[in-house]
Amino acid sequence: MLFAFFGLAQKNVTGNVIDNEGKALAGATIVVQGTSNGTTTDFDGKFSIKSTEGSVLEASYLGYKTQSITIGTNANYEFVLSPDNLLEEVIITGQGSGIQKRKLSTTVDVLNEEEIDKLPALQIDQLLQSTTPSAQIRLSSGQPGTAAIIRTRGALSAATSSTPVIIVDGIRVDNLNSNPSLGADTGGVDISALADIPIESIERIEYIKGGAATTLYGADAANGVIQIITKKGKAGESNIFVETRIGAISGTDDYLKYSRTAEALFEPGLLNEYRLGMNGGTEVSTYNFSASLYKDDSFNDINEQIKRNLSFGFTRNINDKLRYQASMSYVNMDSNLDYNANTSLSRFSGFEGGGRGDLDTMEDATWDTELERSSNIGKSVDIKNRVNRFTASNKFIYKLPYNIEANFTAGLDFRTLVQQENSTNQMLIYQGSIPEGTANRASLDRLVRNNFTLTTDLNFTHRASIDNFDFVTIAGAQFFRTTDRQNLVSGSGGVDGSVSVNTFPTKTSSDFVLENANYGIYFLENVGIYDVVFVEIGGRIDYNTASGESTSALFLPKVGLSYNISDHSFFKNSSISQVLSSVKLRANYGEATNYAGAFSSERTFALESFLGAPALRFSNPGNPDLKSEIVQTTEFGLELGFLNNRINLSGTYYKGITKDALFTPTQPPSSGLLNQIQNIGEIENKGYELAINANIIQKNSHNLDISVSYNKNENIVSSMGGAAPFNVGGFTVIGSWVEEGQSLGYLRGTKATSNGDGTYTFTPNSTLGNTFAPNFGSISLNYSWDKLNFFVSGDYQTGGEIVDLSFLLRHLRGVDNTGIPDDLVGTTSPFNYVNFFTFKNDFLKIRNIGVSYNFGEITNIFSNIRVGFTATNPFNWTTGLWDPETTGSGIGTQNGFSSGGFYYGTESAPRTFITSIRFEF
């Protein structure tokens, strides 16, 4: 009888959720308070749930204020949610709990789930390329899985990579953005660990820039932090989706000197991707599962990649005090690479660099022979990469008495790379490197790199209010350990068909081991005064074993102030608030660090073989006074919102000084010493960041948002400590240099200046330009009309320079004198007028254009069907026949410095045209 009464008391409650403009909110969470009964709204914002009279329904949606309604006799209800204050967004501030954005004195670029899902990017650097308004992300090649040069606020160090620290659900992951120490010599293409971080499981990305914002993150965070939060499900009925994408890939031929290069190497490719996802849960636990399979045969006759991904996220309220969060992902990726850039085996470099002659004037019969040769070489190139990656995070959140919350995080990232280069006799014969009939010159190189990172973190957050003061206190300790083990085995003198090093008559092996641990203790105090002024004081004591026993722990402080003027009651009640909705001032100072490489401070010897016996020689001279370089950043900012925050302006001025900068100047030959890294430099970066986000149209069925950003950076080496200029990249005749008074990695070479009478003055070691473009930014447009969405995103840069080395090679080979004065051609070495091969690296690139349409619930089976089309890299505008992004110079050492600035012998990122259809259940 009790069950019968309960069944009669329950009824079916329906309704819808809209915003204050009448727009349906799809995916809003509806929960009966005090129960595990919940659901989510469909695409039209509608819901249906079982409940009883007197119960309280609660509707919530990210970015909106939660609303509650008590169920009465009616069977249908409408929730109208109001947007939450834009400055109430919660930012994860280190290893602790989140803090409302309005309380922070620093800036963070945020990419949400909706923006991530609609972009077709395969790699996280591609995803962020035009969506982070204050970052420069430049893909170095169009080959699969290759690295990007990532920078914010200028180049900070001449000793390390500019790649930010990557954190996934509180766990540090491998962020190697260069070739491994023992990696294959493909000519300059570098495989990136960022390429195999799964995209489809990401809920949110926070790009945290240097200075005070990164102080709490510890070792090597001076270049910023990319913090990834993965999906873990939402309370409500289970939601399932199946999505398929199919598209075409074509080579970008905008920058080719010869159209015949594309004829020989480019061929349209096909891509396929299949995705499956499921999420749901109750107030007690939620889950999210996703799987994907991606395959493409790229835009040329060699490259191919297959990527498989499984991801799982989970939350569980174990009791009213303890909450558990977990995430796991597994990625398997296979790819093939082609030779490129700085190797004689590169077909692309051979064609574009004039190594095969002037293709435009070549006879058809000769060209047919070249086509056959290129095809034969392509079929015999065998460079394979296989990645297996497992990442796991576990987090326990425990509510202690007195408003204290404890957070414990533990997890790991394990990444294995197998890289194999098989150079056959047949390929060398096609190349012309060995005579026809040679059968004993094949070689095989196989690298296995295992990188293991363990992270543990324990912190406590306390929140309190006393009269008109609010306090958020975070204190904790962190430990992470990284182990990088590489083993390279090589065989030479073999026959074709050999796939085991054991079958080669000559075998060699080498290894590389890098292990270091980092210990950190950190704290942050955020004090709110009358809920309008917030003062931050924090710091971290950081110690890294890579720095050696002679280096003590570092203290990295931060202080900050934010003042939300518009939160005063007098401002809210004034007439100006109808136009100027929000005003926030902020200022901060913070320090971050970059450690020197392992064993850099030690005096070492190298053990070699001489006449079959062991022999010792001097190696690293050693520097017992070596310490970490410190980046000190001061920042001032202003944020304005107009017309109920429909127009938002943000401006930031920053100045960062790298103290005790790590430089490795060249020792004079007379000293008899090898080069030694030293704390002798100082680097200065200053500039400003401007951004505007405008909601131009806000109607029931129409919405138009436009965003534009502009960034200015001035980079200069302010001190060399008396050392002579030294080279950090590029080539002998024209390189990337470090010199006092110049930007870091500036271009230097011999410059020819006309005297007006047919003669020229040649000036060695002249400044040719800056590899870093000082002006850059992004643009985006997003328009929705009812169920239709259209978006465009792009980025730009101006003011830097690039060397067209392919042009220089063509000129050296006598096939291209474009723009070179007749008085110079043939009268002196081209290395005496390299300024004629140096050009502006300005560009405007549209990265993505996309359109999608949601049909909603058109059948009883599907809650929504979405179809879409996207194009990547569809339009480019540059100052010449060179791609300002790509660089064939590579990165000389593992995690080393790279300035870019050399267009040479590698393909640009391809164009893709993708159609998609998504079924939601």
Cite the ranges covered by each PLM segment.
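Surface-exposed, extracytoplasmic segments of Gram-negative outer-membrane nutrient-acquisition systems
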Residues: 612-617, 657-680, 707, 714-771, ...
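Outer-membrane beta-barrel transmembrane domain signature of Gram-negative proteins
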Residues: 255-279, 424, 435-534, 621, ...
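Short acidic/polar hinge/loop motifs at secondary-structure boundaries
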Residues: 47-50, 171-209
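Short, acidic, small-residue-rich periplasmic hinge/interaction motif at the N-terminus
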Residues: 16-33, 56-64, 72-117, 125
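Outer-membrane beta-barrel transmembrane strand signature
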Residues: 168, 260-275, 286-290, 294, ...
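Extracytoplasmic beta-strand/coil segments of soluble accessory domains associated
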Residues: 50, 126-175, 180, 203-204, ...
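N-terminal periplasmic "start-of-domain" segments of outer-membrane beta-barrel proteins
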Residues: 29-46, 91-119, 145-149, 177-188, ...
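Flexible loop and strand-edge segments within Gram-negative outer membrane beta-barrel domains
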Residues: 246, 261, 271-280, 284-292, ...
